[in-house]
Regions:
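Cleavable N-terminal export/targeting peptides
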Residues: 1-21
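Residues in intrinsically disordered, low-complexity segments of regulatory proteins
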Residues: 4-6, 95, 322-323, 391
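Outer-membrane beta-barrel pore domains
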Residues: 17-28, 62, 129, 227-396
Length: 396
């Protein structure tokens, strides 16, 4: 009888341990307005599922002109879903082992897929496909932008999404001794391409000095009305050989005036950017200056240097005008670049004004915008286009 009781007691203990283990590994879900979250009770796994829709009306419905012929194209109005994204993120195993996936439902392609190890602030590691931390403008999410689209210079100088690995971190020293850094090695063939084709990697680096003592993230609009000024200055560079001279979410391609590479590694490219950002009491400003040197190895080492810059600022006028609606921001941007060595031969200009009404920060906002892009050749304007747009961007 004692043996029977002992057996029953042992069975009960084992069953209790199994129940406890099951309970600790069980998952629970919640929705807080910023995605549907799932997390295990023992915190070994988490998943957040988010969606984002961007509805846009534009007249005319064209993208930013990149050559003279674009101004002569008669485009109709655009109305529809401009972006539809599904985002997954969370951690696995340990809270500092993080993953992220972003899927473009409009064009049916994976934009981002990363695995990150972020145990220490000063030393972190990431592998996968994502937007290279190069220029501030491109690193800001399209859902967090101040304007509907990035400036006209973005297409010329961005490294966009690449496959590779990166070390990065933040050194938070006393006073002005606050720095962020990123160094990476990538395929250099753009989104969705697993090969670098020519055996030459893309090498990148970015150093950001947060000289007012607090790290400045990749974001636009001072929605929170920063009480203490925040500012950053950064320099970044990249070096690679490729048959491509530009990158976008669609993948790799070539700029105007550059033919598709006849040989792998035809273009030897070195480029750099200097950028800055500032936030204080509803005011936000940022600017970038770019240079990009392209050597065509298949054309007697012909060298072309592209230059461009933009300045952008936004302000919640309610901070100065009592009757101005508190969620309404006014923003403006000026940008210019030359697609050729001789800046007097050809130069593009952009002038944009936008009004943002934030229902719930960048998670739910309405934007009205007027943007004028023009082209000068030999100091005479030969093309211009003014685009009127209205956009609703909502995340859930």
């Amino acid at each position: 009888l004692s043996a029977l009781w002992a057996s029953l007691f042992h069975t009960t203990v084992v069953a209790s341990e199994v129940d406890i283990e099951r309970e600790s590994s069980a998952t629970f879900s919640q929705y807080n307005g910023n995605g549907l979250s799932f997390q295990s009770n023992n915190n070994t796994f988490s998943l957040r599922v988010r969606g984002r829709l961007q509805f846009r009306y534009a007249n005319p419905g064209i993208s930013q002109p990149t050559e003279r012929a674009d101004f002569e194209h008669n485009a109709g109005n655009q109305f529809g879903v401009n972006r539809a994204r599904v985002k997954l993120d969370g951690h696995i195993g340990l809270p500092w082992i993080k993953y992220g996936v972003e899927y473009d439902a409009v064009d049916q392609r994976t934009l981002t897929a990363t695995l990150s190890f972020e145990k220490y602030d000063a030393l972190r590691f990431k592998v996968g496909q994502w937007k290279v931390e190069y220029s501030r403008e491109r690193s800001v999410s399209s859902g967090g932008q101040q304007m509907m689209d990035r400036s006209i210079i973005n297409r010329i100088f961005t490294l966009d999404r690449q496959m590779g690995a990166s070390l990065y971190g933040n050194f938070d020293g006393p006073g002005a001794a606050n720095f962020n850094y990123w160094v990476g090695v990538f395929n250099g063939s753009g989104r969705g391409d697993y090969s670098n084709h020519d055996g030459e990697n893309m090498y990148t680096g970015r150093l950001q000095w947060n000289f007012l003592g607090e790290s400045v993230g990749f974001k636009n609009s001072d929605i929170k009305r920063t009480a203490t000024p925040k500012a950053a200055l950064a320099i970044a560079g990249a070096k690679f050989k490729s048959q491509f001279t530009r990158f976008s979410s669609s993948g790799a391609g070539n700029l105007a005036n550059f033919s598709a590479g006849e040989i792998e590694g035809q273009y030897d490219i070195q480029q750099f950017v200097i950028d800055g950002a500032y936030f204080y009491k509803g005011f936000n400003a940022q600017a970038e200056y770019h240079e990009k040197d392209i050597v065509d190895l298949a054309d007697n080492n012909r060298e072309t240097t592209l230059r461009g810059y933009y300045v952008q600022a936004g302000y919640f006028l309610s901070e100065s005008i009592s009757w101005w609606p508190e969620p309404l921001e006014m923003a403006a941007r000026f940008g210019t670049y030359s697609p050729r060595d001789s800046e007097q031969d050809e130069r593009f200009f952009e002038k944009t004004v936008a009004f943002n009404y934030f229902f719930n920060g960048h998670e739910n906002k309405l934007t009205a915008e007027v943007s004028r892009v023009s082209l000068d050749q030999f100091d005479a304007e030969v093309g211009d286009e003014t685009i009127y747009s209205l956009q609703w961007d909502v995340s859930f």
